């Protein structure tokens, strides 16, 4: 090794050591000036020998070029959300559910943490080196923020210590301390820049900067709280043990993590944290309570998109009184019509509130609300303002009733409210302007029609300029019209036109999924396509006939039936076919003639597959006579469980359904 290589290695090791002491142990040994001197020395040596610069060098936190947009990263292990409780009674009920499910009379050991009010992120280390980072996004897919996360000094670019797994995905919260937030806003007011409403918004805005040099100037920090991918190594078998191991490897962990051996101890922890909340120096909105034992976590499993072994115990929201001046009705991307109260502006939890959600017609009836009423406003979870109750004793004489619309306030289509649901929805579907942008984005997405290069910003411009009203209009676009869009040159425009032409050749299942019918995901679309075979047969199906499809119940059947009953939707489908959208003729599969262990079986896939994509697995299973369903029920014959299988696996085990792993599936596919 050359002398300069030895110097570089020693300097990097020394700087990483002091970063660990400062950010993780909160026990710096040297003054900032000495740290800066060491960093300057390292930069000077690397300038002499740029060929010796390594990606994990402390000098390489900032250096990536500004991005034009964030790429998407699909989470190999989904980032689930947590269920919430808001009072002691609800927590005690949660504790009892856990004990009942474990069939135990002994107290559960809980690991309690602060619920940080920041941005959830996933950070992947390979052989101890940070290789990628992503936002939570929708839990399945997030944005690639690797360059920005590298600028956060609390996050090590390289882990130190022994027995570091080959692949380790650390999950945690990026947040902004109160002092840093105040400094950012102070600078913004002085320079005429953007002033943030709260530290969470500032943290999110800082982390989503396209230019990492801007992120580097923001005093963001990080605490880790969990793990996603774990390959080529082992971790302790308790949650606290894992956090302590992370800390030993150089990752920051909150010093308020506490083990509680009884429900009362958890409540004491909650009250103490609530009391200390104003002095923490950063925002939290509750505490997170997790079963400490990993074995018990696995036994408890998951439900929907949340674990059964953890809960967020939120702090009470702050409340104020004000008057409802009007009620307007907004239409969301799925057609949900939401009443919104326009309020006399009032400060709630440090934020000026002028609007509050009323959720739905049932909520208005429950509140007994009228326009002009004096109401109590709460910022639920410290974020979303809502009306808690009407102050009936101070009701003015001039109040008037709230009339829920019978037609969509945007497109005029009829509204529907399915039995058993609280939400009223517009039936306009593909022609409703309020739903148009999101419907089109879904239509062109990778798992739907898969139009390469047709990003969200292009869709936004096409709708705003009224170039596109329905999905069929996309296939009428010309390169000349696209060239007029922002950042769209002739070559890019022609590429999009070519991609649209290519997308016309699809499958019946993809086409159904692309239509965006409520509750019809990929698995349901595939089931409908396989059962009915043709669009004509599906359009003519009754609600009873639709329910014969595996995994389709009354709710889904009603949504499908109503979608095809709407004349405007049928018109758009006709236009799409006229523009050349097509798919192969159905292949009739006689299950009795197929010699396969999957023939005639209803199969559910869960977890991540490593040997093939989920789409490929579905296609091969269907080709061998299987019916692939999206959820586990008593009708399910077989569950194929990949890595990080969750609630579907747990339900299959409860019902005694046969479960195999990916390796066994591949063996049977070749049988």
UniProtKB/Swiss-Prot annotation:
Its EC number is 6.5.1.2. NAD(+) binds at residues 32-36, 81-82, 113, 136, 173, 290, 314. Its cofactor is Mg(2+); Mn(2+). SUPFAM superfamilies: BRCT domain, DNA ligase/mRNA capping enzyme, catalytic domain, Nucleic acid-binding proteins, RuvA domain 2-like. Pfam families: BRCT (PF00533), DNA_ligase_aden (PF01653), DNA_ligase_OB (PF03120), DNA_ligase_ZBD (PF03119), HHH_2 (PF12826), HHH_5 (PF14520), Nlig-Ia (PF22745). It comes from the Bacteria. It catalyses: NAD(+) + (deoxyribonucleotide)n-3'-hydroxyl + 5'-phospho-(deoxyribonucleotide)m = (deoxyribonucleotide)n+m + AMP + beta-nicotinamide D-nucleotide. Transmembrane segments: none annotated. One of its GO terms (molecular function) is DNA ligase (NAD+) activity. Zn(2+) binds at residues 408, 411, 426, 432. Residues 593-671 form the BRCT domain. GO terms for biological process: DNA repair; DNA replication. SMART domains: BRCT, HhH1, LIGANc. PROSITE patterns: BRCT, DNA_LIGASE_N1, DNA_LIGASE_N2. Keywords: DNA damage, DNA repair, DNA replication, Ligase, Magnesium, Manganese, Metal-binding, NAD, Zinc. The active site is at residue 115. One of its GO terms (cellular component) is cytosol. CDD domains: BRCT_DNA_ligase_like, LIGANc. Belongs to the NAD-dependent DNA ligase family. LigA subfamily. DNA ligase that catalyzes the formation of phosphodiester linkages between 5'-phosphoryl and 3'-hydroxyl groups in double-stranded DNA using NAD as a coenzyme and as the energy source for the reaction. It is essential for DNA replication and repair of damaged DNA. This is DNA ligase. It comes from Salmonella newport (strain SL254).
């Amino acid at each position: 090794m050359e002398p300069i290589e030895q110097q570089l290695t020693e300097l990097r090791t020394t700087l990483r050591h002091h970063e660990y002491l400062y950010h993780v142990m909160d026990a710096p040994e040297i003054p900032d000036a000495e740290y800066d001197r060491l960093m300057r020395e390292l930069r000077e040596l690397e300038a002499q020998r740029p060929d010796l610069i390594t990606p994990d060098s402390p000098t390489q936190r900032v250096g990536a070029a500004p991005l034009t947009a964030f790429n998407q990263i699909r989470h190999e292990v989904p980032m689930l959300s947590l269920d919430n409780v808001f009072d002691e009674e609800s927590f005690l009920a949660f504790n009892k559910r856990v004990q009942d499910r474990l069939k135990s009379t002994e107290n559960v050991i809980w690991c309690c943490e602060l619920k940080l009010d920041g941005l959830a992120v996933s950070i992947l280390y390979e052989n101890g080196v940070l290789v990628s980072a992503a936002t939570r996004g929708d839990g399945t897919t997030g944005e690639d923020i690797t360059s920005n996360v590298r600028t956060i000094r609390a996050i090590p670019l390289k882990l130190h210590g022994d027995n570091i797994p080959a692949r380790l995905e650390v999950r945690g919260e990026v947040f902004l301390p109160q002092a840093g937030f105040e400094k950012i806003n102070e600078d913004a007011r002085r320079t005429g820049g953007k002033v943030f409403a709260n530290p969470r918004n500032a943290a999110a805005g800082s982390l989503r900067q396209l230019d990492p040099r801007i992120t580097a100037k923001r005093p963001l920090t990080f605490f880790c709280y969990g793990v996603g991918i774990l390959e080529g190594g082992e971790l302790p078998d308790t949650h606290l043990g894992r956090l302590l191991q992370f800390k030993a490897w150089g990752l920051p962990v909150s010093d308020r993590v506490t083990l509680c051996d009884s429900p009362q101890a958890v409540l004491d922890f909650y009250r103490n944290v609530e009391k200390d909340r104003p002095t923490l120096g950063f925002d939290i909105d509750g505490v997170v309570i997790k079963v400490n034992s990993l074995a018990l976590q696995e036994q408890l499993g998951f439900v929907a998109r949340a674990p059964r072994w953890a809960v967020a115990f939120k702090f009470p929201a702050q409340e104020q009184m004000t008057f409802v001046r009007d009620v307007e009705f907004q239409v969301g991307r799925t057609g949900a019509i939401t009443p919104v109260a326009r309020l006399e502006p009032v400060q709630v939890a440090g934020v000026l509130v002028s609007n509050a959600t009323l959720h739905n017609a049932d909520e208005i009836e429950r509140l007994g609300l009228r326009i002009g009423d004096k109401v109590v406003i709460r910022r639920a979870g410290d974020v979303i303002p809502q009306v808690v109750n009407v102050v009936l004793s101070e009701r003015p004489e001039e109040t008037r009733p709230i009339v829920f619309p019978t037609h969509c306030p945007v497109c005029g289509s009829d509204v529907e409210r399915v039995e058993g649901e609280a939400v009223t929805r517009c039936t306009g579907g593909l022609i409703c302007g309020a739903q148009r942008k999101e419907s089109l984005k879904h239509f062109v997405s990778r798992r739907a029609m898969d139009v390469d290069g047709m990003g969200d910003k292009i869709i936004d411009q096409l709708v705003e300029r009224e170039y596109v009203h329905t999905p069929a209009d996309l296939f009428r676009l010309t390169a000349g019209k696209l060239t007029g869009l922002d950042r769209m040159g002739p070559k890019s425009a022609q590429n999009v036109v070519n991609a649209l032409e290519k997308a016309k050749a699809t499958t019946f299942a993809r086409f159904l999924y692309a239509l965006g019918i409520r509750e019809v995901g990929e698995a349901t679309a595939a089931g409908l396509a396989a059962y009915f075979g043709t669009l004509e047969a599906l359009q003519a199906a009754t609600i009873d006939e639709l329910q014969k499809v595996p995994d389709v119940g009354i709710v889904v059947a009603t949504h499908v039936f109503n979608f095809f009953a709407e004349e405007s939707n049928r018109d758009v489908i006709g236009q799409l076919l006229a523009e050349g959208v097509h798919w192969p003729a159905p292949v009739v599969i006689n299950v009795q003639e197929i010699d396969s262990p999957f023939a005639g079986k209803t199969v559910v896939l869960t977890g991540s597959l490593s040997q093939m994509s989920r789409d490929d697995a579905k296609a091969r299973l269907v080709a061998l006579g299987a019916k692939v369903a999206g959820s586990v029920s008593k009708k399910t014959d077989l569950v194929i469980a990949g890595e990080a299988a969750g609630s579907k696996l747990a339900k299959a085990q409860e019902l005694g359904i046969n479960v195999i792993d990916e390796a066994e599936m591949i063996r049977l596919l070749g049988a």
